[in-house]
Amino acid sequence: LRDYANRVINGGPVEAAGPPA
């Protein structure tokens, strides 16, 4: 969940976020 959480926290779109590994 590191990449997913980081991108969501950074304000990036969830669609562009990596897979919730």
Swiss-Prot record:
The keyword Secreted applies. Inhibits angiotensin-converting enzyme (ACE), but does not serve as substrate for the enzyme. Potentiate bradykinin (BK) on the isolated guinea pig ileum as well as the isolated rat uterus for contraction. Also potentiates in vivo the depressor effect of BK on arterial blood pressure in the normotensive anesthetized rat. Intracerebroventricular injection into mice does not show toxic activity. This is Bradykinin-potentiating peptide K12. One of its GO terms (biological process) is regulation of blood pressure. One of its GO terms (cellular component) is extracellular region. Residues 1-21 are annotated as: Disordered. One of its GO terms (molecular function) is peptidase inhibitor activity. The keyword Secreted applies. It comes from the Eukaryota. The lineage of its organism: Eukaryota, Metazoa, Ecdysozoa, Arthropoda, Chelicerata. Expressed by the venom gland. It is found in: Secreted. Belongs to the non-disulfide-bridged peptide (NDBP) superfamily. Scorpion BPP (group 1) family. It comes from Buthus occitanus (Common European scorpion). Keywords: Hypotensive agent, Metalloenzyme inhibitor, Metalloprotease inhibitor, Protease inhibitor, Secreted.
